[in-house]
Curated annotation (Swiss-Prot):
CDD domains, A to Z: Maf
The protein, known as: 7-methyl-GTP pyrophosphatase
Cellular component per GO, a single term: cytoplasm
Predominant localisation class: cytoplasm
Example GO molecular function: nucleoside triphosphate diphosphatase activity
Cofactor(s) this protein cannot do without: a divalent metal cation
Keyword Hydrolase: yes
Length: 190
């Protein structure tokens, strides 16, 4: 079996990939995550997933490298990871009662081959009061998550609905698409 590398230091992505029961290592991708001028959120996610995989693949010839990225999209504007509580409050306030699109891209780069996929998840947030936003951030300050919430935790209470073909995509790694790409690359999965 060829060597498999996850180009990420994200604990969320490591946990998800471990569900496929394949042995893998991780590598830290060094890429500039700034959007290019006029770049759509879906294109940004796709480009960053490919760049992350390529940045690690160049150091490990012969390995298959998985890169993934997620971009939250509110009315065509990319929302980054908040980083601060104030920014998380602003994001959650802006998303309150609205639909947010999450573009989650995955790239698999190996010897002389690249495979790519993109998943779209739509999250309908319920109307949130300022007090609810404060209580949520007190309980689960999701400052390292696109959209300022963790759907796998208490963040699910902020939603009215989720629409997606792959429920793992919202956590940051679309396993249905990735399993397909891995099978195409010759990995043995059920």
């Amino acid at each position: 079996m060829p060597r498999l590398i996850l180009a990420s230091t994200s604990a969320y992505r490591r946990q998800l990939l471990s569900r496929l029961q394949l042995e893998f290592d991780t590598g830290r991708p060094e890429v500039d995550e700034q959007p290019q001028s006029g770049e759509a959120p879906s294109a940004l996610a796709s480009r960053l997933a490919a760049e992350k995989a390529a940045a690690v693949a160049v150091r490990l010839p012969g390995a298959w490298v998985i890169g993934s990225d997620q971009v939250a999209d509110l009315d065509g504007q990319a929302l980054g990871k908040p980083g601060t509580r104030a920014q998380a409050q602003a994001q959650l306030t802006a998303m309150s009662g609205r639909t947010v699109r999450f573009h989650t891209a995955v790239s698999l780069i190996g010897p002389e081959r690249e495979l790519h996929a993109l998943d779209l998840t739509e999250v309908q947030l319920r109307a949130l009061t300022p007090a609810e936003i404060e209580r949520y951030l007190d309980a689960e300050p999701a400052l390292d998550c696109a959209g300022s919430f963790k759907c796998e935790g208490l963040g699910i209470s902020l939603f009215d609905a989720i629409r997606s073909q792959d429920p793992t995509a919202l956590v940051g790694l679309p396993l249905i698409a990735l399993a397909r790409l891995l099978r195409e690359a010759g990995f043995h999965l059920p």
